[in-house]
Swiss-Prot record:
It is an enzyme of class 3 (hydrolase). The lineage of its organism: Eukaryota, Fungi, Dikarya, Ascomycota, Pezizomycotina. The active site is at S26, D204, H207. This is Rhamnogalacturonan acetylesterase. GO terms for molecular function: rhamnogalacturonan acetylesterase activity. Its main location: secreted. Residues 1-17 form the signal peptide. The keyword Repeat does not apply. It is found in: Secreted. SUPFAM superfamilies: SGNH hydrolase. It comes from Emericella nidulans (strain FGSC A4 / ATCC 38163 / CBS 112.46 / NRRL 194 / M139).
Length: 245
């Protein structure tokens, strides 16, 4: 795999010609194992997987992780942004990840770890990150979150949650590419059937094992091909089963 896993983005070699940066949570992260590293063999450029478990769009922003990517990326690089699994909840018992309710410029005031914080909405955090990367000349792709196990109840069921729509809205507002990763993953999971898909989730209904993450990666790549977004230009594989959605 052509993959870069760094503890500090400052260590990234500046000589790399082109890189795909991945920003997300545990469903994408290397250590889980998430799907991010599994696209490496299907692209012609390097992967820098900066996804980290337990993060939301808010906490990734507060920790300076979007800015850290912006500080090292070069014009022509790609950034894939995918969040949503950790963005729900209530600010009344603030876990540091929950976003302000709404889909626009609403704000909420909170105190987290003894520090006052103005909390933005999910679309605002994602849009701000996309605009930050655009200013650096990057090709930005916002991706909807992966589904929880749609076979968990014994019958296939997939209904996109609000963060899927919010991700698409943020992409529209920022003027960047969007793929519905969740829908493509759900479609493939429906075709594979309950027994196979249930085996992908050995611990809980959110995190796939290595085999499942490989399938989720293929779903992402298929979404890229079918959507005709800029990232398609660096794919070395475009032969995915099934029709486009």
């Amino acid at each position: 795999m052509k993959s870069i896993a760094l503890t500090s983005l400052s260590l990234l070699p500046s000589a790399l010609a082109q890189t795909i940066y991945l920003a997300g949570d545990s469903t994408m992260a290397s250590s889980t194992p998430g799907w991010g590293d599994y696209i490496a063999d299907s692209v012609s450029v390097e992967i820098s997987n900066q996804a980290i478990g337990g993060r939301s769009a808010r906490s990734y922003t507060r920790e300076g992780r979007f800015q850290a990517i912006a500080d090292v990326l070069q014009a022509g690089d790609y950034v894939v942004i995918e969040f949503g699994h950790n963005d729900g909840g209530s600010l009344s018992n603030d876990n540091g990840r929950t976003d302000c309710p709404g889909d626009g410029d609403e704000t909420c005031e909170t105190v987290y770890n003894g520090v006052a914080e103005t909390v933005l909405t999910f679309p605002a955090y994602i849009e701000n990150a996309a605009l930050l990367f655009l200013e650096k000349g990057a090709n930005v792709l916002i991706s909807s979150q992966t589904p929880n196990n749609p076979w968990e109840s014994g019958t296939f069921s997939y209904t996109p949650n609000r963060f899927v729509g919010y991700a698409e809205l943020a992409a529209q507002r920022a003027g960047v590419d969007y793929v519905d990763h969740g829908a493509y993953t759900a479609s493939i999971f429906e075709a594979l059937g309950a027994d196979t898909v249930n085996s992908f989730y050995p611990n809980d209904h959110t995190h796939t094992n290595a085999e499942g993450s490989s399938v989720v990666a293929d779903a992402f790549l298929k979404a890229v091909v079918c959507s005709g977004v800029a990232l398609n230009d660096v794919l070395t594989r475009t032969d995915f089963d099934g029709e486009c959605l």
